[in-house]
A protein has these predicted regions:
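Ferredoxin-type iron-sulfur electron-transfer modules and their immediate structural context
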Residues: 147, 151-291, 324, 334-353
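Short acidic (Asp/Glu) and glycine-rich catalytic loops that position anionic groups and cofactors
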Residues: 139-141, 231-236, 294-298, 314
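Membrane-embedded alpha-helical bundles of multi-pass integral membrane proteins
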Residues: 1-196
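Amphipathic, alpha-helical segments enriched in basic
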Residues: 15, 19, 23, 58, ...
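Iron-sulfur-cluster electron-transfer modules
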Residues: 1-48, 52, 216-225, 251, ...
């Protein structure tokens, strides 16, 4: 409402056009002021945690450079916008008290009124300059920040709700079933199935197993990559990361988003068509070492406040490595061979288990 009023006042030339709402308007403006103060307090808390206390999850390698600058810039921008709002109201309240022309008696200023002693000695002309300057800087700051929003991690304030809504309803820890593999297994186990019933010419191309690049991701996984808040709770809970492994669930989502951005620029350059650039998400952004460090404990999924599932992407990429590249680690191949031959992951027969 406050922003809408500022826009309408700027277009029409009025001042506090919603003042006709009376008591409701006063409650709204007062609530905005309290909210602005709480936002500033929260921002200071977040800044201290990030830059002074230096919590470990904010000091990980993936947050070096532009990611850290982006997070701090957002804090500075929001603080500036809130301070301009309060200073604008402070000057407005003083102008109302002085019965300045065009400044009708409207609004309730519980926070700004405490700042009036800082400017009560200023002339009406100076107060008008302060109020108008803060008005312009406030609206320009909001418009600039809204444009920057789509290029920063702060986009999560728009995407968190839809991402949570579209999150999987499967029990946590349950993996999705690959229908192509299921159909193949059913065909092998069905004694009445005719493997030659479908000719080669009429057969559909086999579905790719797993994920190699972002073009293989589902739209929900793409949404999750942009929803990531980079808070690091997932990485903070990851046992692989805590024991010094290269894996960071947060980095998985950040690298996925970086690759999506790169593919998007490629499509823009080639007029809506993707031209192969010799890169893929698997290998150029996310390494096999990261994938196989995952213990599939699901801690990252449970820790995420906006229902992002890094584990699903990790497992899909593992599936591609194993089923498309035959690149499973030697230890995994040995275990599978033992299960096939001995009915257990250990390298000795069933008859020797009790010895």
């Amino acid at each position: 409402i406050e922003l809408l009023e500022i826009v309408i006042d700027g277009i029409v030339g009025t001042h506090r056009i919603f003042a006709v709402l009376g008591t409701f308007y006063n409650i709204v403006i007062g609530s905005f002021e309290v909210l602005a103060l709480l936002v500033i307090v929260a921002i200071i808390t977040f800044w201290v945690r990030r830059n002074l206390l230096k919590l470990s999850r904010f000091q990980k390698p993936e947050l070096k450079g532009s990611a850290k600058k982006d997070a701090n810039f957002i804090l500075y921008a929001e603080t500036t916008i809130m301070l301009l709002f309060l200073l604008m109201n402070t000057a407005d309240a003083q102008l109302q008290a002085l019965n300045a022309p065009h400044y009708l008696q409207a609004g309730y200023f519980p926070i700004s009124s405490m700042l009036i002693p800082l400017i009560d000695s200023f002339s009406v002309g100076t107060l008008i300059i302060i109020e108008r300057t803060c008005w312009w800087l406030h609206i320009i700051g909001i418009l600039c920040f809204l444009n920057y929003l789509y290029y920063s991690k702060h986009l999560h304030i728009l995407l968190a709700f839809p991402n949570t809504y579209f999150a999987s309803l499967r029990p946590m820890g349950a993996f999705k079933v690959n229908e192509a593999i299921t159909n193949e297994v059913k065909l092998m186990l069905n004694p009445e199935a005719d493997p030659f019933a479908t000719t080669t010419e009429s057969a559909t191309p086999p579905e790719k197993f797993g994920i190699q690049d972002v073009t293989d991701l589902t739209w929900v996984q793409l949404l999750s990559a942009y929803t990531c808040t980079e808070c690091g709770r997932c990485t903070d809970e990851c046992p692989a990361n805590l024991t010094g492994k290269k894996l960071s669930p947060r980095a998985i989502m950040m690298k996925t988003r970086d690759r999506i951005e790169e593919v998007g620029r490629n499509i823009d350059r080639h007029k809506g068509k993707f031209e192969a650039d010799g890169k893929t998400l698997l290998g150029d952004y996310i390494t096999a070492e990261e994938l196989w460090a995952c213990t599939t404990c699901n801690a990252c999924v449970e820790a995420c406040p906006v229902s992002i599932n890094p584990l699903e992407i990790i497992m899909d990429m593992r599936q591609y490595v194993v089923m498309e590249q035959s690149g499973a680690p030697n230890e995994l191949n040995m275990m599978m061979n033992n299960i096939e031959n001995n009915g257990a992951p250990w390298a000795y027969s069933q008859a020797d288990r009790l010895q």
